[in-house]
Each structure stands twice: as C-alpha cells, then as structure tokens.
Amino acid sequence: MASTSRGEEKKKIKLKITKNKMITVFVIIAAVAVAYIYALYVPKPVYSVDYRGIILNFRVDLREANKIPVEPGPDQVYTELINPLVKNITIVYKPTGDPDEDKYYSLAAFEIAEKLKLGMLARTIYDVGIDAKPLSEFNRTDYVNLPGKIQHPLIAVIHPIYANQTRVFAAPGHVIYIEATSYEGFDLAIAKFLISALKIKF
C-alpha cells in the first residue's frame, strides 16, 4: 500500500513538472513570436536616408517629421525649389535679440543649406546659390509680403517665439514658411520641409 501511494505521488510530481515545463516553453515561444512580430511590423525611427547615392543624416526621426502638415502640399515646396529657373535661394529670419535663441536660426540655416546643396548635387544641379539673411536686408520687420521671385525663392524660418502654429507653408509669391511653436516642432518642421523639397522617400 505504501509503495503504491509513493508511486502515485511520483507520478503527480512528474506530471506537475511536465505541466510547468510546458507552460514555461509556451511562454518563451509566445514572447519570441511577439518580439518577432513587433520587430517586423512596428516602424523603426529613420535618422538617415540614401538619397540618390548621397547619405543624408538628420537630427530627428523622419517618421515623426513626416507628420508635420505641409500647405497646400509637398509638391508645391518641391516645384518652388527644384526648378530650372531658380538661381538663388535665401533663408530669411527675424532675429530675437537673444544670442542663445538666435542659435536656433544658425542651426536651422545650416541644416537647410547643407541638405539642399547635397540634394541638388545628387540631382546634378550645380548653379544654385543658398544664403541666409535677416528680415532687415529686405526692409521688413515681419514676415508679411516678402519679395520672393521665381528665380530667387525665399525660405522664411519662423522661430517658436514668433510662431503660432507648426507647419510648412508654400505661400504665393515664391515664399516657403517653416514655423513651429516648440523647439522640437521646429526641428521636425525643418526636416519635413527637406522631405518635401527633395521628395525624400524612406
């Protein structure tokens, strides 16, 4: 009788161990499957792209930047700048009077000019100059009625101090506005402008 009950206890213990092992194996397989599906289907951040053989590196995730609205649409930004009539592009800004805040303009102007130049080189466009000037160079104190031309479009970069929305706006009169109400939005809007201007795919 005692040996029979011991045998039954051993079977129960083995059965419990086997069930626990099966549950553990099942949990591990399920976790691996979930991780694989996540890695396969959840988009990863994009910080660099191969643009016609030239690597363009960005400071922000292009997937996030792509959510910034472009008015009336990305094609208007592209056709304004990638145009055989364009000879010069000027980045226009309104100084804040604070050197720390104005650093954002320097960073924005550098990123825009560098990426546009590289993008144009990739498209074999060699004769377009890009520079940056304060509004005072155009006898203006604000961004209204900027004198853009088809041969000389303007990119008006609006600091978060002055902006009341976050967007890229291709306005009539050959002026493209980049504006944002936050510093993060400012960086994203600049990236969205470049995505639109160069038709970057990722």
Protein language model annotation of sequence segments:
Residues I54-F202:
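Long, folded non-catalytic interaction modules
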Residues M1-D50:
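Secretory targeting signatures
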